[in-house]
Every structure is written in structure tokens, then in C-alpha cells.
Amino acid sequence: MRVAFYAPMKSPNHPVPSGDRLMARLLIRALERAGHQVEVVSEFRTHAPTPEAAAALAPAISAEMARLREKWQKEPRPDLWFCYHPYYKSPDPFGPAIAAELAIPYVTAEASYAAKRDRTDWAGRQKRVGEAVMQAAVNISFTERDRAGLSAAFPQARLAALKPFIDSALFEAVRPAPDPSRLMTVAMMRAGDKMESYAMLAKALRLIENKPWTLSVIGDGPMHREVEGLFAGFPGRIEWLGERSETEIAGLLARGGIYVWPGCGEAYGLAYLEAQAAGLPVVAQKTAGVPAVVEAGVTGLLTPEGNVAAYAGAIAALLGDGQKREAMGQAARRFVLEERSLATAARVLDEILRKAQEQE
């Protein structure tokens, strides 16, 4: 199929790395692996920080819609429109209308709907997301949490599940050589949930200063100085590795002993899958979408949300139990390479799309 791919929040071609950009790219790779021809049909970002900023986008949205309509007067039409991550701050203003005009299926992945926004100034954009979900031939959710949310808001919506995945090829190529006391984390340094996780991690490590550990941090961002400040009390124990390529990250993770990231507000967190693919057990919180990517008690330890002492205790437990740490690391690698690979995702995604097309 010819797939018109659109990510209203952040294009897969955006220069700034993020989980959203990575998942958009992974979806494209999975679609292509399944034999589909994928085109990113628009770079237009509808993401807006305020309702006022959203309203100001209207003229540009109209111009982009006109461009897209003209495009398919001259070029072969797509067989399907695929929208990744529409939600109230970044709805898809193009796909539903174009799909209807071209008589092709409209599909969403990771659509999100928060009913509490219905009573705010975001109500107009929220309504657009709801209409798109109801129009969709299928709405693909990556976590049970998201699927249940859509089902509750739109009982008649057509839903399907695709578990979070990564391209595991880079990790299959590296041989784990863990330093048992080396803690690893990979995360952007920005305000909000990321900063909250960094702060919680620093607090937890203060509770286990007497344990033999070092921490290697991969990532960068606008809050770099503030993040460094959180860990200023650990001289000689923190290694700042900055932003790295996918290949470098795979190699660095393979040298680690335990992956530590609290995961405050994480939709799911692809970095957890990358760490497990490299053979690292995970210590995270049982919060948001994290349980969708870590098998509690098998590939890692998940602690109660907000409990710093429990989180510190879980890190200490794995530091002190080499047999358990090694067993979890091996299970983690098997879990991702066998169940959460690009090949597996491509198969499932292809089945979902073909079924959706047949039902249209």
C-alpha cells in the first residue's frame, strides 16, 4: 500500500531527538519492512502551547490543506492515511478530510483523548481528535492504558493493539559486557517529567551513597546545567556522556550493569526497551505506561509511584545480588529481541492495516 504518513506533533524529520520522533521513525521502518511505500506527506506542526497559539495557526493550516489537495490532483493517490499521535495540543487537521475526499482508510496510532479538556479552551481541538478517532478505520494503541482511555471515551471506536517496539538490530550486534556497579540512564534534559525523574533519581542515589556504584548519563538538553546540579554531591561518580548516536548508545548500554530511570509520566519509554535489548535489567516506577515495556519481576523491578525509598532500595537490591541481576539482564534481552523487535511489529502492523482496509 501507498501510505500517507503524518505526525502532527513532531515530524520524523525534526532535528531535535525525542521519543515521539523515534517512534514515528520506527513506525515508518515497520511499515516499509512490511512492504508498504511510505511518504511523510507534511512537515506541518500543529502542536501549540496555548489555545491562543493554536488559533493563530489557522491561516497556515488552510494553506497546507490546499497544498495537499493540489498534490493529489497531480500524483497517484495514497491507499491509506496514517496519523501518529494526535491529541488535543496537536490534532490532525488534514487527514480526516483528505481520507474522506479520496475514499481511503484513515488510521491513527497513539491517539490520546483526555475528557477533562472538554471543559477547557482546548475543547475545539479536543473535539477534532474525537471526530478523527471515530472516523478511523482503526486506532492503534501501544499500551492498555491508552486503549482503555479511548474505549471509555468512544465505545464505538475501532481499536487495535501494537506493543511498543524498537529496531533491535543494533543491539543484536553488540555483546553485553556489563560492569555490575555501573548504573545507566538515557534521557533528554528538559523541564517537566524528565526533570522530575532526574530529581527523583538523584534523591534515591543519596540514600545509597554507601553502595558501590557509578552513574553514566546519556542525553542533553536545555536543562543540562540544572540536571548536573542535582548530582553535584557525587564527586567522581557521575559520567556525563552527552547526546550520542543510536550506534554509540547501543555500545555504551552494553557496558552497563543496571538501567535506572524512574519514568515519571512516561507514555511508555522506548529507552527501557533499548536498555533491555543491551542486556540490562531495569529499575523504574510502576507508573503511566512503564509496565507496557518492563516485565515486573522478570526483566526489572518496578516500585510504587513517588516512593523514593522504595526506588533506592530496588537499585540497592540489584547491586547486591549478582545472580538476580544477571538473570534479569538475560531475560530482558530475550524479551526485547524475541517479542519487541521491528520484525514482530511489522507483522502485527501489517495485519492490522490490511484488516482495516478490508473492512472499509
Name the predicted role of every residue range.
Residues R225-T247:
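Nucleotide-activated donor-binding/catalytic signature segment of Leloir-type glycosyltransferases, i.e.
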Residues C264:
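Aromatic "clamp/platform" in nucleotide-sugar-dependent glycosyltransferases that forms part
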